[in-house]
Amino acid sequence: MTELMKIAALFAVTALAEIVGCYLPWLVLKGGRPVWLLVPAALSLALFAWLLTLHPSAAGRTYAAYGGVYIAVALIWLRVVDGVALTRWDAAGAVLALGGMAVIALQPRA
């Protein structure tokens, strides 16, 4: 597995943890779902924060690179969970964001 694939996989798991941690409260507040869903939401957000610490880069650089993968995972969530068809604009935005992530994540180490 290449370094880029490892980084992208860790970012994808991190993004999923963040999305679940934010989606569950949304279900409680907007969808009238049970309040106990806030417990797994909090655990998911704690997992998200911990996963961010596994990256070797400085925190700001990690967050910047992570943003590209987050966009792609959020669009997959939009399609799979929300059932919304993606547009070519969604795809183009995801490609650009992932390209930015690769530039930031794979820069030469000083």
Curated annotation (Swiss-Prot):
It is found in: Cell inner membrane. It is a multi-pass membrane protein. One of its GO terms (cellular component) is plasma membrane. It holds the Pfam family UPF0060. Its main location: membrane. The chain crosses the membrane at residues 9-29, 34-54, 66-86, 88-108. The keyword Transmembrane applies. Keywords: Cell inner membrane, Cell membrane, Membrane, Transmembrane, Transmembrane helix. Belongs to the UPF0060 family. HAMAP family: UPF0060. This is UPF0060 membrane protein BamMC406_1172.
